[in-house]
Amino acid sequence: MNVAPTLGTGVSSLPPEGALAALGRPGGGSVQGCPFCEGSGGRVVFEGAKLRVIHAEEAGFPAFYRVIWREHAAEFSDLDAADRVLCMEAVTMVEQCLREHLSPDKINLAALGNMVPHLHWHVIARFAGDTHFPGSVWAPVQREADAEQLAAVAARLPEMERAMMARPGTRSF
């Protein structure tokens, strides 16, 4: 299930119109209609007691991951101090693994929540030749996709994900 804006095509699984206010409420648990409460949000790399890391499988961006908080929370400040630290440790761990295994030109981190108001962080390895670089993944396309580069990055993801799972501290998430 793709819940982030698909470049140029909109969003495939948004809640019904008018439901965003209800989805944005703090309080944990699960919220009906929230795609991250009702589904994984992508291919699960690992899932812990507090959060999961998924591979978002966004076309043109083979190394697009999300760190998704398990309980429904709309804002980072809805978490207590210990959970905020834990969440950022997970974001940092994903970023470090992407850097170590893929050597991207840049890592993009984003926590918007405007489309899906369930706390999640986008962690995206970016390469100078990608279709939108140096703009954000949601910016207009600047060039054609380099199929060879996309395939080369995608081929390295399984090893990177195994390393992510083996990283010390992963089990605490």
Can you annotate each of these PLM segments?
Residues 1-173:
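HIT superfamily nucleotide-processing domains
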